[in-house]
Amino acid sequence: TKNHFKFFFLMKDYTSDKNFTSKDFVENPLQKGEYENCTFNQCDFSGQDFSEIKFADCEFVECNLSLIKVVKTAFREVNFKDCKMFGIQFNDCNEFGLNFNFNGCLLNNSSFYKTAIKKTLFKNSKLIEVDFEECDLSNSSFSNCDLSGSIFLQTNLEKVDFRTSFNYSINPENNRLKKAKFSLSEVFGLLDRYDIEIEK
């Protein structure tokens, strides 16, 4: 009976293959539990507590996720598309299997401090004043992203592709840049600390 109750409890908290559209989760918060292969379209989660919720193979499209709390939240193979994601402390997430990608998202003032997020794709996104300090971004790609004011310090940027991104400032002396890719037109972002003038 004890095991039966445990099984029932786990099943109750597990949701799969469900599509949530135009839901206001500010008024009715998302139930704690595990979500697998679910899609969230045009939902409002702003300021909500995602702590200890597990998302696997899920997609968020045109959602407002600004200032959500993600303490021990699991994101495994999760895609965010055209989402508003201001001020999220991704460094609080469950590190096990942490894997996500961002396309067309606003991630301003968010933090990935000390996270290990290799092979992450950031595409067509704004990352204004985002904290990547001591983050492992190796083999990631920033495709057509605005990185104004973002912090790269003791960051592993090996094999990261910055070629189509802009407004970044990266000190080669304080970051690992082996085989990272940059475009000639934006490479001056590696020379900011030297206080030299470069004519385009």
Whereabouts are the PLM-identified features?
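Tandem repeat scaffolds
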Residues: 5, 10-200
